[in-house]
């Protein structure tokens, strides 16, 4: 048996223990995990500093460095997030259907854990803690395979979380961190359909394509966020600028940050100069079509690649469009089914935008940055699914369970 298969088998065995834990036991476990992160803060931050030094040596971009970096505040927020997850309602055992059939059988549909989930991700060490906590809260075993750029941070975080499992008299193999960064090891992991029930890739386009093409296990992709804001002719200009500033500048490396601004031609002469002036203090580089460049001479002429790009940086592509339909056509061509925003005072245009787009999250007069599990009331998320399956959009605890039927009778037969 190969090493990676052995680890997956251990995780599957441990997952059976997790599946039977009471809600209270899981709450105490996650609180202990949060305390372990606080206790190991110095070790985790030192490991992260080493990862950052290595990343700078390799001259990685500022967006990657931002996703990779931890500081005392971010680490404290990670621990607090685990406490928040501990306090969430337990989805396991929830009855979603309860029906007494005419023949007397009692039919229930009940949430149960998926089993073992493999999370393959890049850069963000907070995902190590968040994904582990969410999967464990839902009664699942978790196999984590982070990126090489965060390997030291991930080892330090996983070590703290595994210690909490031991303190709870649970097998630490309920949480496996794959430390072999070789591509062939990840490829082998993706073949283990008898031991792993779901793979969730979260990272760059290359990683997600590799996982989708090679996995023999069901995959829920967390694809790039090419998010748009369309400013309709009837939009409140002050509101549109406020949403633009929030969506583009508060955390440009986030997947729910805006990448493209679409502007109705009737409002463009009034809106775009004001928007450009509002963005200037934040250092946002603008790239626009010919019509935009006519209104804003300092703007760089955009290419097709600009409209398809997930910049994760202070860069914004702009296009002026004649109507809502043209905005929808642009989004269908260049978007990634993540999050789209319309700013409008026209209810009919808002309804058209919502009904004709199939993106995971559609906002009407609200910031793209609300495309987040916590902001949408899920409490926490393992990521934002762009795969049109049962889990679409921010994935909370419910999405890490499945529903099965439990039927009780008194000897009834079908025929």
Swiss-Prot record:
<keyword id="KW-0963">Cytoplasm</keyword>
<comment type="similarity">
    <text>Belongs to the gamma-glutamyl phosphate reductase family.</text>
</comment>
<dbReference type="Pfam" id="PF00171">
    <property type="entry name" value="Aldedh"/>
</dbReference>
<keyword id="KW-0560">Oxidoreductase</keyword>
<dbReference type="InterPro" id="IPR012134">
    <property type="entry name" value="Glu-5-SA_DH"/>
</dbReference>
<protein>
    <recommendedName>
        <fullName>Gamma-glutamyl phosphate reductase</fullName>
        <ecNumber>1.2.1.41</ecNumber>
    </recommendedName>
</protein>
<keyword id="KW-0521">NADP</keyword>
<dbReference type="InterPro" id="IPR015590">
    <property type="entry name" value="Aldehyde_DH_dom"/>
</dbReference>
<dbReference type="GO" id="GO:0055129">
    <property type="term" value="P:L-proline biosynthetic process"/>
</dbReference>
<dbReference type="InterPro" id="IPR016161">
    <property type="entry name" value="Ald_DH/histidinol_DH"/>
</dbReference>
<comment type="pathway">
    <text>Amino-acid biosynthesis; L-proline biosynthesis; L-glutamate 5-semialdehyde from L-glutamate: step 2/2.</text>
</comment>
<dbReference type="InterPro" id="IPR016162">
    <property type="entry name" value="Ald_DH_N"/>
</dbReference>
<dbReference type="InterPro" id="IPR000965">
    <property type="entry name" value="GPR_dom"/>
</dbReference>
<keyword id="KW-0641">Proline biosynthesis</keyword>
<dbReference type="InterPro" id="IPR016163">
    <property type="entry name" value="Ald_DH_C"/>
</dbReference>
<dbReference type="InterPro" id="IPR020593">
    <property type="entry name" value="G-glutamylP_reductase_CS"/>
</dbReference>
<dbReference type="GO" id="GO:0050661">
    <property type="term" value="F:NADP binding"/>
</dbReference>
<comment type="function">
    <text>Catalyzes the NADPH-dependent reduction of L-glutamate 5-phosphate into L-glutamate 5-semialdehyde and phosphate. The product spontaneously undergoes cyclization to form 1-pyrroline-5-carboxylate.</text>
</comment>
<keyword id="KW-0028">Amino-acid biosynthesis</keyword>
<dbReference type="GO" id="GO:0005737">
    <property type="term" value="C:cytoplasm"/>
</dbReference>
<dbReference type="GO" id="GO:0004350">
    <property type="term" value="F:glutamate-5-semialdehyde dehydrogenase activity"/>
</dbReference>
């Amino acid at each position: 048996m190969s090493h990676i298969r052995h680890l997956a088998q251990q995780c599957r065995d441990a997952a059976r223990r997790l599946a039977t834990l009471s809600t209270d036991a899981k709450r105490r476990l996650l609180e202990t995990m949060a305390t372990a992160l606080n206790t190991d803060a110095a070790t985790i931050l030192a490991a992260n500093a080493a990862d950052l030094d290595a990343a700078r040596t390799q001259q990685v971009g500022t967006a990657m460095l931002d996703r990779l970096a931890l500081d005392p505040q971010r680490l404290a927020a990670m621990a607090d997030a685990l406490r928040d997850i501990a306090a969430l309602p337990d989805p396991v055992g929830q009855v979603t259907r309860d029906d007494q059939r005419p023949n007397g059988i009692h039919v229930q549909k009940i949430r149960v854990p998926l089993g073992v989930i493999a999370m393959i991700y890049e850069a963000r060490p907070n995902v190590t803690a968040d994904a582990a906590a969410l999967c464990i809260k839902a009664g699942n075993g978790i196999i984590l395979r982070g990126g090489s750029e965060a390997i030291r941070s991930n080892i330090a975080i996983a070590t703290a979380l595994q210690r909490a499992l031991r303190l709870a008299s649970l097998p630490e193999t309920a949480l496996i961190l794959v430390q072999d960064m070789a591509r062939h090891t990840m490829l082998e992991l993706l073949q283990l359909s008898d031991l792993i029930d779901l793979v969730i890739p979260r990272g760059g386009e290359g990683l997600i394509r590799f996982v989708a093409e090679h996995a023999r296990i069901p995959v829920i992709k967390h694809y790039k966020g090419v998010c748009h804001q369309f400013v309709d002719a009837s939009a409140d200009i002050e509101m549109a600028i406020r949403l633009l500033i929030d969506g583009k500048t508060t955390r440009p490396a986030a997947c729910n940050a805006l990448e493209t601004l679409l502007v109705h031609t009737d409002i463009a002469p009034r809106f775009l100069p004001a928007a450009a002036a509002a963005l200037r203090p934040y250092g946002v580089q603008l790239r626009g079509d010919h019509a935009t460049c006519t209104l804003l001479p300092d703007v760089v002429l955009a290419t097709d690649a600009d409209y398809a790009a997930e910049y994760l940086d202070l860069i914004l592509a702009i296009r002026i469009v004649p109507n809502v339909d043209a905005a929808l056509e642009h989004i269908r061509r260049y978007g990634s089914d993540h999050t789209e925003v319309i700013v409008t005072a026209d209810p009919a245009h808002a309804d058209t935008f919502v009904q004709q787009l199939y993106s995971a999250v559609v906002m009407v007069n609200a910031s793209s940055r609300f495309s987040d599990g916590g902001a949408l009331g899920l409490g926490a998320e393992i990521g934002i699914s762009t795969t049109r399956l049962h889990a679409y959009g921010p994935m909370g605890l419910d999405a890490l369970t499945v529903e099965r039927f439990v039927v009780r009778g008194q000897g009834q037969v079908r025929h």
